[in-house]
From Swiss-Prot:
Function recorded in the entry: Possible role in axon guidance through interaction with RTN4R. (Microbial infection) Acts as a receptor for adeno-associated virus and is involved in adeno-associated virus infection through endocytosis system.
UniProt xrefs under SMART domains: PKD (SM00089)
Protein name: Dyslexia-associated protein KIAA0319-like protein
Residue stretches spanning the membrane: 30-50, 929-949
Record-level GO cellular component terms: cytoplasmic vesicle; Golgi membrane; nucleolus; plasma membrane; trans-Golgi network
Ranges of Low complexity composition bias in the record: 247-261, 287-300
Organism listed in the record: Mus musculus (Mouse)
Gene Ontology biological process: acrosome assembly; flagellated sperm motility; neuron migration; proacrosomal vesicle fusion; receptor-mediated endocytosis of virus by host cell; response to auditory stimulus; spermatogenesis
Composition bias type Polar residues, residue spans: 231-241, 985-994, 1027-1039
Phosphoserine modifications at: 977, 1008, 1030
Amino acid sequence: MEKRLGVKPSPASWVLPGYCWQTSVKLPRSLYLLYSFFCFSVLWLSTDADESRCQQGKTLYGAGLRTEGENHLRLLAGSLPFHACRAACCRDSACHALWWLEGMCFQADCSKPQSCQPFRTDSSNSMLIIFQKSQTTDDLGLLPEDDEPHLLRLGWGRTSWRRQSLLGAPLTLSVPSSHHQSLLRDRQKRDLSVVPTHGAMQHSKVNHSEEAGALSPTSAEVRKTITVAGSFTSNHTTQTPEWPKNVSIHPEPSEHSSPVSGTPQVKSTEHSPTDAPLPVAPSYSYATPTPQASSQSTSAPHPVVKELVVSAGKSVQITLPKNEVQLNAFVLPEAEPGETYTYDWQLITHPTDYSGEVERKHSQSLQLSKLTPGLYEFKVTVDGQNAHGEGYVNVTVKPEPRKNRPPVAVVSPQFQEISLPTTSTIIDGSQSTDDDKIVQYHWEELKGPLREEKISEDTAILKLSKLVPGNYTFSLTVVDSDGATNSTTASLTVNKAVDYPPVANAGPNQVITLPQNSITLFGNQSTDDHGITSYEWSLSPSSKGKVVEMQGVRTPALQLSAMQEGDYTYQLTVTDTAGQQATAQVTVIVQPENNKPPQADAGPDKELTLPVDSTTLDGSKSTDDQRVVSYLWEQSRGPDGVQLENANSSVATVTGLQVGTYVFTLTVKDERNLQSQSSVNVIVKEEINKPPVAKIAGNVVVTLPTSTAELDGSRSSDDKGIVSYLWTRDETSPAAGEVLNHSDHHPVLFLSNLVEGTYTFHLKVTDAKGESDTDRTTVEVKPDPRKSNLVEIILDVNVSQLTERLKGMLIRQIGVLLGVLDSDIIVQKIQPYTEQSTKMLFFVQNDPPHQLFKGHEVAAMLKSELQKQKADFLIFRALEISTVTCQLNCSDHGHCDSFTKRCVCDPFWMENFIKVQLRDGDSNCEWSVLYVIIASFVIVVALGILSWTTICCCKRQKGKPKRKSRYKILDATDQESLELKPTSRAGSKQKGPTLSSSLMHSESELDSDDAIFTWPDREKGKLLYGQNGSVPNGQTPLKSRSAREEIL
């Protein structure tokens, strides 16, 4: 149960004040001050205000907290910042965990075993902090850090949290499956049945701190769940010595128990001002130790609740149209003979709009049917005789996969016919449809007249040109995203040029009224496909004998005059280039005269103020059915001495006016001498002029990127009216900024392209008498608060080609790269960068609470993601990505140029071009020029030494001489001569055979077969000329050789 309250003091601060003040009244005055000092000291020590004992333990992001029982979860009243919420929890001894959920602060009392359980939430703004206040995690009733199977049951080990882009790395708690199984086996082997001894259950004296709620269970109590059965009345409160005085025990209602009996539960008697609901979350139940009902029950042994290991199986995943599944619960240990377990299935998590049917909710197997797509989480509770356990399982229902339907090729028009000189047309195939999308169009000309090349295109709309007469048949084949195809045909007929006869048009019938007796007829609306060569007007035979004068009878316009009352019919004949003719007739009706008197109009009354003493009288708006032939202006009333100029015209001028009222009468006449009169009043007043008053609405404050402003001076006033406005800019104002539509001469001044700074403008108003007045106002332009977080991207596209639809696609692609929603990317400005590129400024924020992401992090992440993706991931190639304001630190050896967005290094420093080219591409000033010169010199010297060494080794290798081999291939003749030679004497060496190779020529080949040179001659160094030349190639003592060696 939750409570909403302020910062809660410690229980000791409630008990000690009453004790101190009641006791101090009984003391003598001499000891009153000493006793009061002692009480204040004890009170200060009991407030737990020392936050040094408050050590923060684990912090879980995206997690919430649920508690068992009542008064364990409290919501602090009011809106507190995070640091105030944490400080309040540190000061409160009953606060062991802090749950911060979207600006709301919840404190949890986890002093009882297993009273606080974390769970995963879908909110990214949820954070759970566990404090260590001189107690271990087990003592506080929270999960120990090694109890990771419970975290797996909450879904933190199987589901990766949503990636928090730009704000931090994702938090994922995972446990290997082998470790999970070992923990389950260890828990199964535990002996959970422990019966406390009589001495341990004896009542002990409770001091003030114990009465304040400082009853912390031991770690053994956390691991062993003990329930105490008892019978209590629903309206009776039993005070026990084991619990504080402000805690009462009431029976907990159960659906299987009567209102007068049940299991007692502890409920605090403290009252909170208001109650506030908590976020809805799944309910996890754990058995907790309960206090003894009475001191007499401590001597009897308590039943022990065994913990059951319950498994609902692995998560189930089905795909529609299959919408049924059966969940089975498995329990260890199995029920004893004669004992059965009760099962209770509960739906914890489900989709927003879901439906389905559940059967056998209280059996071991749960049957689900008619499920809708989404994620369902079920909890099964198993109870037996003094045994309890829970299990969880997820069921995921996926929507039915889409079945592809082949596309439908549609051409429009399917049949088309044109005639020369029209030689081009189009056939539209873009109306072809598919259940997903069409990825390819292919047009093929199946039949047509003989031409140079047939038509074959891959576009949705086929554009045809330079057609020749004949019949064409075109085939359209469409391919959808799944590779299915469909085809259709379109027919086109091109006819030869046809010369159609002309179409004569003499115009509509005309009606005139005497005395008008002339009119012009027009036949230029006549048409022909190749042009008209002649026009001829004539009087119709039905109008022969009527008097009329005709001019231009062989032109498109016929002029008629001297017509009399009656009907005239005229005939127009037109001839084209082929000599074909067409005729048309038109009738002119001449009506008799019907004259009406004219209508005089002298115009509106006028009011003048001296020194203006003249005005004009306008009667030009007078009308007549025929025409007005005369005007006459006369003074009917008023002071004498005025002069009328042009009194016989429609517009007259009156001069010499004095103060007073004048009445002037206008008389008009028509041709039949019919007349009409009208009067106009002219009032002349004395001059009383007041200077004008200039007034501007007020100062204007503009915050960039809004760069327009409006200054309203229309509240300026004058008794006669303001004739001119003039806005001027003060000399101290920034020169940037433009005036729109010459509004500096109008009451309202419109400004654009303002820059940061303060503008001062002066308004000068002038009346008809030349008197003027001025007013002053300021326009303060504040800098853009998002300027440091703005990111600019240069796109390779003309700004006129970037449509709103393409802009939306680009924003969605950038959102995918950054891992944010489309609505989180706010485009501030799109403007041309060059003739073929466009610059787009945007920033990224999360929704809510609209926290801006850092611009340099957004730019860096966008660059990194684009390097990982393909070059054409974005619909337009990104030429450059950077922040609007240059935020490079230049390695603290230079400054950043705001125009080029690159570092300008200090003297003796230069850019690390290797890092720029191979890594992040950001400009820097990391290298010292001196070190670069030294390193370059060392590299050049090392390369020179290496090159010299390589050349020397190569020359030495080439200088070693190579001994040429001297061999001769034995033939049959040589072998026979070797066999016929006599054997040498003992001790003498065998004579060498005759050699005749290209390298060693013997003179024996030229003389005779008896001349034989022996090897001893060679051993003595007497080589014959002609064998190896005159230059010796080296001599070495010869060893005794065999016959074959001597031959070789």
